[in-house]
UniProtKB/Swiss-Prot annotation:
Coiled coil: none annotated. This is Trigger factor. It comes from Lactobacillus acidophilus (strain ATCC 700396 / NCK56 / N2 / NCFM). GO terms for molecular function: peptidyl-prolyl cis-trans isomerase activity; protein folding chaperone; ribosome binding. Involved in protein export. Acts as a chaperone by maintaining the newly synthesized protein in an open conformation. Functions as a peptidyl-prolyl cis-trans isomerase. InterPro entries: PPIase_dom_sf, PPIase_FKBP_dom, Trig_fac, Trigger_fac_C, Trigger_fac_C_sf, Trigger_fac_ribosome-bd_bac, Trigger_fac_ribosome-bd_sf, Trigger_fact/SurA_dom_sf. It is an enzyme of class 5 (isomerase). The lineage of its organism: Bacteria, Bacillati, Bacillota, Bacilli, Lactobacillales. PROSITE patterns: FKBP_PPIASE (PS50059). Gene3D superfamilies: 3.10.50.40, Trigger factor ribosome-binding domain, Trigger factor, C-terminal domain. One of its GO terms (cellular component) is cytoplasm.
Length: 442
């Protein structure tokens, strides 16, 4: 294959390439097969015209357009690979020559990825993370579990925040009832914020048997627009008041909330370990985010083509809607439920698209600089993990995603890990002082 690449701009160029006679012949044969069943030639039954007769009657040139559409995608992809360029978006391709019994020559106007000049990406300074677990953290988790295991017991006297009341209520606006404004024997935890602001507060201090006229104003941004901003009266009857009875903090409690322990001390140790793991994960995520941000900031990229921005927005949109569909919500239903449109969703994803593209370009450049590779074992594991995550057959995943695509994701993660592992944690005060010095020097 004859291929010539000539840059015409920082992210544009012209790719001239040939399509061989053998490829063209295959394309012509396929094009003829597609139209044969509907062909009409005088003296022949419909669909029973040979290729020789077709060429005599219509001329081989009548198949050129269809044949080109058949062979062009593979020919263009091969030319891009041969030229060693990273093409993005859709090229504009025009024929230079399409002579009979000769190779065809095409010229494509192509957008390519911008060049990345890496700066420092090892030893990036990031804010020091504190992963220490304090006694107050353990106590807070124990309190949370006691709350979750609490029993509700009838209470005499006035209701307080944290108590649960059983109520009947009937709401009216301007003396008229409205949909969803009434209920009977409803259990409501005071202070939970379940009801609109002000409702729960007006029940505090009342007892079982009390009738309370609750007066509230629906928020201006309330979901039901016919109620938003309006004052409502709720005739409310309190039937019961219950308070939480927390379990004793002892070995029995420990065994009840976690069957893998036998004592309270064991529960505390397990909580400490779990909290430590959580803090270390949060810390690692923070270090990674800051380190990658630093590596991207240190890199130089000329300009990001619009085609890459649009590809990123398309990817984000398809992934988001795909997640919705896996939850049983099709795009049109989602737009209706959220009162949004596809254009609005695209605009939302477009806000950070340039930064996402720049980050990916820097990570890919690090993959190349460090010569990071994905092994067959890593690709096989990736397929297993994806199949388990999306509840799919491994063969389906393997047929859907190429080894190149999977390998790309694996090596990019390796680049992220490399940046993270080589990051240096320093005191936040030192970083702030350095940032201040950098700003003053500019």
């Amino acid at each position: 294959m004859s291929v010539k690449w000539e840059k015409t701009g920082k992210t544009t160029g012209e790719l001239t390439f040939d399509i061989s006679k053998d490829e063209i012949k295959l394309g012509l044969d396929q094009a003829f097969k597609r139209i044969k069943k509907n062909l009409r030639v005088p003296g022949f039954r419909k669909g029973h015209v040979s290729r020789v007769i077709f060429d005599q009657y219509y001329g081989e040139e009548a198949l050129y357009e269809d044949a080109l559409n058949i062979v062009l995608p593979n020919a263009y992809a091969a030319a891009v690979k041969e030229a060693g360029i990273n093409a993005v978006g859709q090229p504009q391709i025009v024929p230079v020559s399409m002579d009979k019994d000769k190779d065809w020559t095409m010229k494509a106007t192509v957008t390519v990825q911008p060049e990345v000049e890496l700066g420092e990406y090892k030893g990036i300074e990031v804010p020091k993370q504190n992963t220490r677990v304090y006694q107050k953290d353990i106590d807070a988790e124990l309190d949370k579990r006691r709350e979750q295991s609490a029993e509700l017991v009838l209470k005499k006297g006035k209701a307080e925040n944290g108590d649960t009341v059983t109520i009947d209520y009937k709401g009216t606006i301007d003396g008229k009832e409205f949909d969803g404004g009434s209920a009977e024997n409803y259990s409501l935890e005071l202070g939970s914020g379940t009801f609109i602001p002000g409702f729960e507060d007006q029940l505090v201090g009342h007892e079982a048997g009390d009738d309370v006229d609750v007066v509230v104003t629906f928020p201006k941004d309330y979901g039901a627009k016919d109620l938003a901003g309006k004052e409502a009266h709720f005739a409310t009857k309190i039937h019961e008041v219950k308070s939480k009875q927390l379990p004793e903090l002892d070995d029995e409690f420990a065994k009840d909330v976690d069957d893998s322990v036998d004592t309270l001390d064991e529960l505390k140790e397990k909580i400490k370990k779990d909290l430590k793991d959580q803090k270390e994960q949060v810390a690692n995520d923070a270090i990674q985010e800051a380190a990658i941000e630093g590596a991207v900031k240190n890199a130089t990229i000329d300009e990001i083509p619009d085609a890459m921005i649009q590809e990123d927005v398309d990817t984000q949109l398809n992934q988001y809607l795909g997640n919705m569909q896996r939850q049983g919500i099709d795009p049109q239903t989602y737009y209706k439920l959220t009162n949004t449109t596809e254009d609005q969703l695209r605009s939302q994803f477009a806000k950070n698209a340039a930064e996402r593209v720049k980050t990916n370009l820097v990570l890919e450049a690090i993959v190349a600089a460090e010569d990071l590779k994905a092994t067959k074992e890593e690709i096989d594991k990736e397929i297993k993990d994806l199949a388990a995550e999306y509840n799919m057959d491994e063969k389906v995943v393997r047929n859907t995603l190429s080894d190149d695509m999977l390998g790309h994701d694996i090596t990019v993660r390796k680049a992220m890990d490399l940046i993270t592992d080589n990051a240096k944690q320093v005191a936040k005060s030192k970083l702030e002082a350095k940032d201040s010095d950098d700003k003053e020097s500019k």
